[in-house]
């Protein structure tokens, strides 16, 4: 934390230097970066989950008309899609589900094991390979949150080789204390 302050944060614009011409990454976005003294990865996860639930609860209580409009619009748009492409829950139902349930917490190794046992992997439906030490692709994240768990998922303890050099190394010497929070319909929202 900053100058002996135990809990601080910054909120400001972030710009991507790499090519961001995708539907998954923004070239510019606003980011909150909390810094907490004497905290571990569990504290980081708890903060991320609590913060996201707070934001969603706030929107549900103060923006009811706007959310109802978006919900109705999404239902109308999805009615044009094939059934297998439609969400099982409406926007409002998904938001209520997020705030009323704990996020699933798994390790990267557990995520790989789940993916290796999945029907899409066994039927060779994934475009990208699933193996330990390879970064998860959006199709893998989507399967975990939308098909397997059907709720937000926190993945921890990634291989050191796929995360930033400054991440704290775990006792096993192979993984680091890093986490991502994945949301249905979005993908990585914290990480």
Model-derived segments and spans:
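Flexible, glycine/charged-enriched surface loops at secondary-structure junctions
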Residues: 61-71
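A translation/RNA-centric and nucleic-acid-associated enzymatic feature enriched
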Residues: 1-57, 72-191
